[in-house]
UniProtKB/Swiss-Prot annotation:
EC number per UniProt: 2.1.1.163, 2.1.1.201
Keyword Cytoplasm: no
Alphabetical keyword list: Menaquinone biosynthesis, Methyltransferase, S-adenosyl-L-methionine, Transferase, Ubiquinone biosynthesis
Superkingdom of this protein's organism: Bacteria
Catalytic reaction annotation: a 2-demethylmenaquinol + S-adenosyl-L-methionine = a menaquinol + S-adenosyl-L-homocysteine + H(+); a 2-methoxy-6-(all-trans-polyprenyl)benzene-1,4-diol + S-adenosyl-L-methionine = a 5-methoxy-2-methyl-3-(all-trans-polyprenyl)benzene-1,4-diol + S-adenosyl-L-homocysteine + H(+)
Gene: ubiE
This protein's name: Ubiquinone/menaquinone biosynthesis C-methyltransferase UbiE
UniProt-listed InterPro entries: SAM-dependent_MTases_sf, UbiE/COQ5_MeTrFase, UbiE/COQ5_MeTrFase_CS
Binding, S-adenosyl-L-methionine: 79, 100, 128-129
Entry-linked CDD domains: AdoMet_MTases
Protein purpose: Methyltransferase required for the conversion of demethylmenaquinol (DMKH2) to menaquinol (MKH2) and the conversion of 2-polyprenyl-6-methoxy-1,4-benzoquinol (DDMQH2) to 2-polyprenyl-3-methyl-6-methoxy-1,4-benzoquinol (DMQH2).
Pfam family, one: Ubie_methyltran
């Protein structure tokens, strides 16, 4: 559980990075972070991952099983990397919905994809992952890439994703996770808490947002815990694949 109670009448709290904040404030604080970083989000992704995020996303697409005519939901779709690829895969008879709770990220994604000529089979929706505004049994595939760690009630979000999937539909969760060896873990800590905020300061003049992003990664459930959460939410055949020594993990579950 993410929340904590300090007394019977106290509002539940949850983590915002390493800080505990009232649950009602987390979404607003996360929104402020992504309003701040939206304009240079793609540039920072390339700089901070050395371009590796493109390989991680490519692997997710390969495991998605998406094909012509499918309906895909890309949650926390941000600037549209996955949506662009899925748009090509589903073709004119399919549909991709790019959903993001953050209006700034959604605008950047819409503008970027329109500039690239991606339209026709793509819809943009501002939506909360915990309360997805879509019918039951609607999508063949749901993805959430580097977004689940920012969700306040992850269990609610996973159940919401299960609800909108068709039976046999796939959920893919691509997220930063826990390195699988001590050497990588130490190097990753140094990188996250020194280099990431420094680059944030130099490129976006915002070190605090990138400090939060580093902290949010550490507070995210590890590979086995997230697998158990997906099973508890109702997913079947849940597996995960570690990438870059566990820095990133791709979880996949099927709706029974």
């Amino acid at each position: 559980m993410n929340d904590q109670r300090k007394g019977s009448d106290a509002e539940p709290t949850t983590h915002f990075g390493y800080k505990n904040v009232p649950e009602s404030q987390k979404a607003e604080k996360v929104a402020e972070v992504f309003h701040s970083v939206a304009a240079k989000y793609d540039l920072m992704n390339d700089l901070l991952s050395g371009g590796m995020h493109r390989l991680w996303k490519r692997f997710a697409i390969e495991l998605s099983g998406v094909r012509t005519g499918n309906r895909v939901l890309d949650i926390a779709g941000g600037t549209g990397d996955l949506t662009r690829k899925f748009s090509n895969l589903v073709g004119p008879t399919g549909q991709v919905v790019l959903a993001d709770i953050n209006a700034s990220m959604l605008k950047v994604g819409r503008d970027r994809l329109l500039d690239l000529g991606v339209s026709g089979n793509v819809e943009f929706v501002q939506a909360d992952a915990e309360k997805l505004p879509f019918p039951d049994n609607h999508f063949d595939c749901v993805t959430i890439a580097f977004g689940l760690r920012n969700v306040t009630h992850k269990e609610d979000a996973l159940r919401s994703m299960l609800r909108v999937l068709k039976p046999g539909g796939r959920l893919l969760v691509l997220e930063f996770s826990k390195p699988t060896n001590k050497l990588m873990s130490k190097a990753y800590d140094a990188y996250s808490f020194a280099f990431m905020p420094l680059m944030g300061k130099l490129v976006t003049n915002d070190s605090e947002s990138y400090r939060y992003l580093a902290e949010s990664i550490r507070m995210h459930p590890n590979q086995e815990t997230l697998k158990s959460m997906m099973v508890d939410a109702g997913f079947d055949r849940v597996t995960y694949h570690n990438m870059t020594a566990g820095v990133v993990a791709l979880h996949r579950g099927i709706k029974p």
